[in-house]
Amino acid sequence: THSHSDHIGGVECLALMNRYVGIKFLDKPKLTMLINEPYEKVLWEMSLRGGMEWNEVNGEGKRLGFSDFFDVVRPTLKTSVPREIWEVNYGDIHIELFLTNHIPEQAPSSEEAFITYGLFVDNRIFISGDTKFDRELIDMYASRSEWMFHDSQINPNPVHACLPELKTLPKEITEKMFLMHYPDNAQANAIDEFAGWAQQGMRYIFD
């Protein structure tokens, strides 16, 4: 969804291990990456390139690039209004990727923020990704969502939604909203109006 290390910190290691162990010795394919062209450039140039480009030259005698590690699946631009939304079908899964307003603190809207995305899966499940409290975004997807997973800090935060802000939402939204990306001590707080805290390591299956 975006380039902070708590979201991409393992990508370099995963890609290198796959190239030099998985592909070389275990007959594994390249990793599949669902990513649009604007974010691929950001991810490679600003985060991954320094640790991945110089490990060898490829079959064409060039230093390694993004496509040497990943089979890329491109979303298509669905709309730019009221915010940028991309979509892609991967197997039986349909995914929308929508811009969020996460960073910098001073960005007044998703259009003026650095590239960060949230997900809407199979026209059913909303995953906010990292975002400030953005009522416009929530209202765009709330009526279409069976369940919602939303970024939540406990105290006011300049780049994340916080619990007091999310508690201003109507019951028909909060009762289907799980809170995620919360600090370790968050569960000491009462959230009876919400669906619950999203649990680390838990697989959620929606029939």
Describe the residue ranges of each PLM region:
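Cap/insert and terminal regions of metallo-dependent hydrolase folds
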Residues: 114, 131-207
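Binuclear metal-dependent hydrolase catalytic cores
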Residues: 1-126, 185-207
